[in-house]
Amino acid sequence: MTDIINKLQAFADANPQSIAVRHTTDELTYQQLMDESSKLAHRLQGSKKPMILFGHMSPYMIVGMIGAIKAGCGYVPVDTSIPEDRIKMIINKVQPEFVFNTTDESFESLEGEVFTIEDIKTSQDPVIFDSQIKDNDTVYTIFTSGSTGEPKGVQIEYASLVQFTEWMLELNKSGNEQQWLNQAPFSFDLSVMAIYPCLASGGTLNLVDKNMINKPKLLNEMLTSIPINIWVSTPSFMEMCLLLPTLNEEQYGSLNEFFFCGEILPHRAAKALVSRFPSATIYNTYGPTEATVAVTSIQITQEILDQYPTLPVGVERPGARLSTTDEGELVIEGQSVSLGYLKNDQKTAEVFNFDDGIRTYHTGDKAKFENGQWFIQGRIDFQIKLNGYRMELEEIETQLRQSEFVKEAIVVPVYKNDKVIHLIGAIVPTTEVTDNAEMTKNIKNDLKSRLPEYMIPRKFEWMEQLPLTSNGKIDRKKIAEVING
């Protein structure tokens, strides 16, 4: 495996003025990125605890990542937009020696020695630093939601990141020195899919500002000014952008490669994208945070769209061996699997196994292997029981999306005394709803040919678009709040 830091340094030596990272009006060259990260690494040297990387979209967040990797301590990205109580939970769990605060604000909850951007800019530390990271070191820890309300810190090994990056570069058909688009916040592991493959291939990492997440017109302005080649995002963010009629190959001929991860890619959205960008390479990928971003991929073509009404997630990559339990739960084994949850042995033991030096992870996803392809069939914990019938909400959503009247759909269970009493469908219709009763009848008639009566939502709520979280995923919690009043 080729060391990422060595690749970055070699490219910086050969192309010092090439732009490495860009965010709105701020940018850093490769030489600046490597120099500034070396100055930070000198300050972190010898630390045995991960550095807290605090902030939001900015070039200096990348400086923080590379600096922490060089120092060998790794980093924990913490987004400023999350609640203060959650920040405190993460800080208490990590107990950091060092914090790199890339914002202009000060936060009482930050513990340890705090560095700012200005500290690094004005530092007299040397701009040369020999990377200390080892293959078995933890390179980053990303906190995800926990069922108990306490976030879980997923620890990823450096060798796993290097292997993932090499796989991404093998998939990449656009070549080196490309303009990459990253939509995801740094606290969401989808960002890893853009950051390291981009920089390891001498590309420019273009960061989508957080204000653009629910405003496709602002993104349109960005795409007009920068010839983006490679787009990395969630399917939901891309679907929102497809509301722009100008998002097509004729207007943006430089856009020739798409990578999607983080959620299921709806057939209708993929069909629209293939139609608008017929010459582009489009990848659907799948993977949990606990297995280094993504473990499968498939190139979406018209042939694949014609063959599969529900899209597969493809075949496994190096470092990931997939299988299912008797209950249909997907299990991942190999180098891609996380080292477990930071300081949480109980939760780690529940889903990870490290026997005989082989790492395995039970995903909680239902899956099947058919015709040489893997298919994700929803979450085990998205199962509900209604009138004695056990059912998958995502199965109902998939069938709703097959209807000619439905563009997007989420199914929300309605509870009374902790019991599901009926279902409501949150629907983005394909046309304006002028007659509520007629549209409801049409959709229910469509469902009756594919689902038993007990799985059909009692009623539907019409929405212009489904709200997204800051990560660019569909915000199920917000939809439920809107529906339940």
UniProtKB/Swiss-Prot annotation:
Catalytic activity as recorded in UniProt: holo-[D-alanyl-carrier protein] + D-alanine + ATP = D-alanyl-[D-alanyl-carrier protein] + AMP + diphosphate
Q: What is its main location?
A: cytoplasm
List GO terms (cellular component aspect): cytoplasm
Q: Which Gene3D superfamilies match?
A: 3.30.300.30, N-terminal domain of ligase-like
One Pfam match: AMP-binding
Give the metabolic or biological pathway: Cell wall biogenesis; lipoteichoic acid biosynthesis
- Give the keywords, sorted: ATP-binding, Cytoplasm, Ligase, Nucleotide-binding
Q: Per UniProt, where does D-alanine bind?
A: 189, 293, 473
Record's keyword annotation contains Nucleotide-binding: yes
Q: Which GO terms describe its molecular function?
A: ATP binding; D-alanine [D-alanyl carrier protein] ligase activity
* Residues the entry annotates as binding ATP: 144-145, 284-289, 365, 473
What EC number(s) does this enzyme carry? 6.2.1.54
Which GO terms fall under biological process for this protein? Answer: lipoteichoic acid biosynthetic process
| Protein function | Catalyzes the first step in the D-alanylation of lipoteichoic acid (LTA), the activation of D-alanine and its transfer onto the D-alanyl carrier protein (Dcp) DltC. In an ATP-dependent two-step reaction, forms a high energy D-alanyl-AMP intermediate, followed by transfer of the D-alanyl residue as a thiol ester to the phosphopantheinyl prosthetic group of the Dcp. D-alanylation of LTA plays an important role in modulating the properties of the cell wall in Gram-positive bacteria, influencing the net charge of the cell wall.
| Similarity-based family | Belongs to the ATP-dependent AMP-binding enzyme family. DltA subfamily.
What is the protein name given in its UniProt record?
D-alanine--D-alanyl carrier protein ligase
Per the UniProt record, the source organism is Staphylococcus aureus (strain bovine RF122 / ET3-1)
